[in-house]
Amino acid sequence: MSLLSALTSISKPMNTSSKSSVSSKNASGLSMGSNSIACGSCGGGSYGYPGAGLLAIVDVNVNIDIDINLSATRSYSCGCN
């Protein structure tokens, strides 16, 4: 399974409807958006997976940005704006 198809299936939970879009941002990035992911009652948040040089961020607008990142930290945050 490719990274793109794995992220697409994660961004489309079975019991919700969603709109998704995929577009390239630059040579080292890809942007995906979906309105179907929620973080508690607020929706949104951020989650980083940079361990292998890859960073995935889910922001409060539920966009997933994938970029090259050499950081070794992993974090998750969720909150209301």
From Swiss-Prot:
Alphabetized Pfam families for the sequence: Coiled (PF05710)
Domain of life: Eukaryota
GO biological process: sorocarp development
Segments of skewed composition (Low complexity): 9-31
InterPro entries: HssA/B-like_chaperone, HssA/B-related
PANTHER family reported for this sequence: HSSA/B-LIKE PROTEIN 1-RELATED-RELATED (PTHR31059), HSSA_B-LIKE PROTEIN 1-RELATED (PTHR31059:SF5)
Full protein name: HssA/B-like protein 1
Species for this entry: Dictyostelium discoideum (Social amoeba)
